Amino acid sequence: MKKPIPLLLLVVVAAGFSFAADPPKQPVPYSHKQHLAMGLPCKNCHTSPDPGEMMGIPPVKVCMGCHTSVKTESPHIQKLAKHAADKTEPPWVRIYQIPSYVFFSHKVHLETGAKCEGCHGPVAAREALWKETNISMGACMECHRQNKASNDCTYCHEARQ
């Protein structure tokens, strides 16, 4: 009798590829690859009113900062322009969610030399993004251990000034 291990291994690997994270369908496609290839730094779009604490999905007015004159004939840009005119935001699908009981500062991480790719994967190579990294307490603590950052509970679970 042949051993079923090679066949089983093939099935497991194939299943892994079929369950690989697909990018969520966004209301307007956005290519990080295309925008970063033009030399635009992440902070051009990913800003926040409170510098650096929580960056997130840029408001449509940020997109329109360029797209009032760039690719205006694109149906996708026209969709963004409609949202801007209506003062509404597209119903973006958030990829990463940080629980409200966790204090997380992009600013602190970037100031210590962390790169966006460390958590978000090779953004510059992606047409669309998907959840590439398990954002969990264990993953954060492991990164803190590797980078000699504090793993004291209050470091992330109490707002710091």
Please provide the spans of the model-predicted regions:
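Positively charged n-region of N-terminal signal peptides that target proteins for export
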Residues: 1-4
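Boundary at the C-terminal end of the N-terminal hydrophobic targeting segment
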Residues: 17-22
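Bacterial N-terminal signal peptides
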Residues: 8-15
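Alpha-helix-centered segments that form part of catalytic cores
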Residues: 85-110
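Sequence context surrounding c-type heme c attachment/ligation sites in exported
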Residues: 24-78, 102-161
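Short, surface-exposed beta-strand/loop segments
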Residues: 76-87
